[in-house]
Protein backbone atom coordinates (compact mmCIF):
# COMPACT_ATOMS: atom_id res chain seq x y z
CA UNK A 1 0.00 0.00 0.00
CA UNK A 2 1.09 3.54 -0.72
CA UNK A 3 0.67 6.09 2.06
CA UNK A 4 1.32 9.76 1.38
CA UNK A 5 1.92 12.23 4.21
CA UNK A 6 0.62 15.62 3.03
CA UNK A 7 -0.64 18.93 4.40
CA UNK A 8 -4.42 19.01 4.85
CA UNK A 9 -4.95 21.34 1.92
CA UNK A 10 -3.72 18.67 -0.51
CA UNK A 11 -6.03 15.85 0.54
CA UNK A 12 -8.85 16.43 -1.94
CA UNK A 13 -6.45 16.85 -4.86
CA UNK A 14 -4.52 13.69 -3.99
CA UNK A 15 -7.61 11.58 -3.39
CA UNK A 16 -9.11 12.74 -6.69
CA UNK A 17 -5.96 11.98 -8.67
CA UNK A 18 -4.93 8.80 -6.79
CA UNK A 19 -7.91 7.32 -4.94
CA UNK A 20 -5.91 4.16 -4.25
CA UNK A 21 -3.37 6.05 -2.10
CA UNK A 22 -3.75 6.08 1.67
CA UNK A 23 -3.47 9.59 3.12
CA UNK A 24 -1.76 10.58 6.37
CA UNK A 25 -2.59 14.24 6.99
CA UNK A 26 -0.03 16.56 8.47
CA UNK A 27 -1.17 18.63 11.44
CA UNK A 28 -0.58 21.77 9.37
CA UNK A 29 -2.77 22.75 6.42
CA UNK A 30 -0.05 24.26 4.23
CA UNK A 31 3.27 22.51 4.83
CA UNK A 32 5.07 19.46 6.21
CA UNK A 33 5.49 19.99 9.94
CA UNK A 34 5.31 16.65 11.73
CA UNK A 35 6.33 13.03 11.68
CA UNK A 36 4.06 10.37 13.14
CA UNK A 37 3.94 6.60 12.92
CA UNK A 38 6.92 6.63 10.58
CA UNK A 39 8.39 3.32 11.78
CA UNK A 40 5.38 1.45 10.38
CA UNK A 41 6.48 2.02 6.79
CA UNK A 42 8.75 -0.38 4.92
CA UNK A 43 10.28 2.36 2.77
CA UNK A 44 10.19 6.15 2.78
CA UNK A 45 10.86 8.85 0.21
CA UNK A 46 10.97 12.51 1.11
CA UNK A 47 11.40 15.69 -0.88
CA UNK A 48 9.05 16.12 -3.84
CA UNK A 49 6.52 18.81 -2.95
CA UNK A 50 8.00 19.24 0.52
CA UNK A 51 8.69 22.97 0.45
CA UNK A 52 11.24 24.79 2.57
CA UNK A 53 9.20 26.11 5.49
CA UNK A 54 11.11 26.32 8.82
CA UNK A 55 8.68 23.75 10.30
CA UNK A 56 9.66 21.38 7.49
CA UNK A 57 13.31 21.57 8.56
CA UNK A 58 12.32 20.53 12.09
CA UNK A 59 10.13 17.71 10.78
CA UNK A 60 12.92 16.46 8.50
CA UNK A 61 15.27 16.51 11.49
CA UNK A 62 12.72 14.46 13.49
CA UNK A 63 12.43 11.98 10.63
CA UNK A 64 16.20 11.55 10.43
CA UNK A 65 16.36 10.97 14.20
CA UNK A 66 13.86 8.10 14.22
CA UNK A 67 14.37 6.33 10.89
CA UNK A 68 17.10 3.73 10.63
CA UNK A 69 16.20 2.18 7.27
CA UNK A 70 17.47 3.64 3.98
CA UNK A 71 15.54 6.63 2.66
CA UNK A 72 15.08 8.02 -0.83
CA UNK A 73 15.88 11.74 -0.59
CA UNK A 74 15.10 14.18 -3.40
CA UNK A 75 14.07 17.75 -4.26
CA UNK A 76 13.34 20.05 -1.33
CA UNK A 77 14.62 17.53 1.23
CA UNK A 78 18.01 17.88 -0.51
CA UNK A 79 17.68 21.67 -0.41
CA UNK A 80 16.85 21.59 3.31
CA UNK A 81 19.87 19.37 3.95
CA UNK A 82 22.07 21.72 1.89
CA UNK A 83 20.91 24.65 4.04
CA UNK A 84 21.34 22.64 7.27
CA UNK A 85 24.52 20.63 6.73
CA UNK A 86 24.38 19.09 10.22
CA UNK A 87 21.51 16.94 8.90
CA UNK A 88 23.96 15.13 6.59
CA UNK A 89 25.40 13.03 9.40
CA UNK A 90 21.90 11.89 10.39
CA UNK A 91 20.99 10.36 7.03
CA UNK A 92 20.72 6.59 7.49
CA UNK A 93 23.45 4.55 5.78
CA UNK A 94 22.55 3.08 2.38
CA UNK A 95 20.05 5.87 1.68
CA UNK A 96 19.67 7.03 -1.91
CA UNK A 97 20.01 10.71 -2.81
CA UNK A 98 18.73 11.77 -6.23
CA UNK A 99 20.06 15.28 -6.89
CA UNK A 100 20.38 17.11 -10.17
CA UNK A 101 23.75 18.90 -10.55
CA UNK A 102 22.68 22.16 -8.87
CA UNK A 103 21.14 20.32 -5.90
CA UNK A 104 24.33 18.30 -5.51
CA UNK A 105 26.48 21.45 -5.69
CA UNK A 106 24.39 23.00 -2.90
CA UNK A 107 25.18 20.01 -0.69
CA UNK A 108 28.80 19.30 -1.65
CA UNK A 109 30.02 22.69 -2.88
CA UNK A 110 30.30 24.21 -6.36
CA UNK A 111 32.09 22.20 -9.02
CA UNK A 112 33.97 23.80 -11.89
CA UNK A 113 32.98 21.06 -14.36
CA UNK A 114 31.09 17.78 -14.69
CA UNK A 115 34.16 15.64 -14.06
CA UNK A 116 34.91 17.38 -10.78
CA UNK A 117 31.24 17.00 -9.75
CA UNK A 118 31.37 13.28 -10.58
CA UNK A 119 34.51 12.79 -8.46
CA UNK A 120 32.86 14.71 -5.60
CA UNK A 121 29.72 12.57 -5.89
CA UNK A 122 31.79 9.39 -5.80
CA UNK A 123 33.70 10.55 -2.69
CA UNK A 124 30.50 11.85 -1.08
CA UNK A 125 28.74 8.50 -1.55
CA UNK A 126 31.69 6.62 -0.07
CA UNK A 127 32.24 9.04 2.83
CA UNK A 128 28.56 9.05 3.85
CA UNK A 129 27.84 5.40 2.93
CA UNK A 130 25.06 6.46 0.55
CA UNK A 131 24.09 6.07 -3.06
CA UNK A 132 24.08 9.28 -5.09
CA UNK A 133 22.04 9.19 -8.29
CA UNK A 134 23.41 12.30 -10.00
CA UNK A 135 20.72 13.06 -12.59
CA UNK A 136 21.63 14.43 -15.98
CA UNK A 137 22.03 13.56 -19.66
CA UNK A 138 24.26 10.70 -18.49
CA UNK A 139 22.99 9.89 -15.02
CA UNK A 140 25.79 8.73 -12.73
CA UNK A 141 25.01 6.29 -9.94
CA UNK A 142 27.71 6.49 -7.27
CA UNK A 143 27.58 3.72 -4.68
CA UNK A 144 28.81 3.57 -1.10
CA UNK A 145 31.52 1.14 -2.22
CA UNK A 146 32.97 3.66 -4.68
CA UNK A 147 31.57 2.13 -7.85
CA UNK A 148 30.12 4.44 -10.48
CA UNK A 149 27.56 3.32 -13.05
CA UNK A 150 26.23 5.39 -15.93
CA UNK A 151 22.79 5.37 -17.50
CA UNK A 152 23.03 6.85 -20.97
CA UNK A 153 19.56 5.91 -22.19
CA UNK A 154 17.83 9.13 -21.16
CA UNK A 155 16.25 11.50 -23.64
CA UNK A 156 15.44 15.24 -23.78
CA UNK A 157 11.84 14.51 -22.78
CA UNK A 158 13.07 13.55 -19.32
CA UNK A 159 14.49 17.04 -18.72
CA UNK A 160 11.16 18.35 -17.52
CA UNK A 161 9.58 19.21 -14.19
CA UNK A 162 8.36 16.12 -12.38
CA UNK A 163 10.49 13.47 -14.07
CA UNK A 164 12.83 13.40 -11.05
CA UNK A 165 9.80 12.88 -8.81
CA UNK A 166 8.86 9.88 -10.94
CA UNK A 167 12.38 8.48 -10.53
CA UNK A 168 12.07 8.92 -6.76
CA UNK A 169 8.80 6.98 -6.86
CA UNK A 170 10.30 4.17 -8.92
CA UNK A 171 13.26 3.80 -6.56
CA UNK A 172 10.87 3.88 -3.58
CA UNK A 173 8.72 1.16 -5.16
CA UNK A 174 11.78 -1.04 -5.67
CA UNK A 175 12.82 -0.53 -2.03
CA UNK A 176 9.28 -1.32 -0.86
CA UNK A 177 9.42 -4.62 -2.74
CA UNK A 178 12.57 -5.55 -0.86
CA UNK A 179 14.86 -5.43 -3.88
CA UNK A 180 18.50 -5.57 -2.85
CA UNK A 181 19.99 -2.08 -2.85
CA UNK A 182 22.91 -3.13 -5.02
CA UNK A 183 20.42 -4.10 -7.75
CA UNK A 184 18.50 -0.85 -7.45
CA UNK A 185 21.71 1.04 -8.15
CA UNK A 186 21.92 -0.52 -11.57
Q: How would you label these PLM feature ranges?
A:
Residues 1-75, 79-96, 101-184:
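Small-residue (G/A/S/T)-rich helix-start motifs and N-terminal tracts that mark the onset
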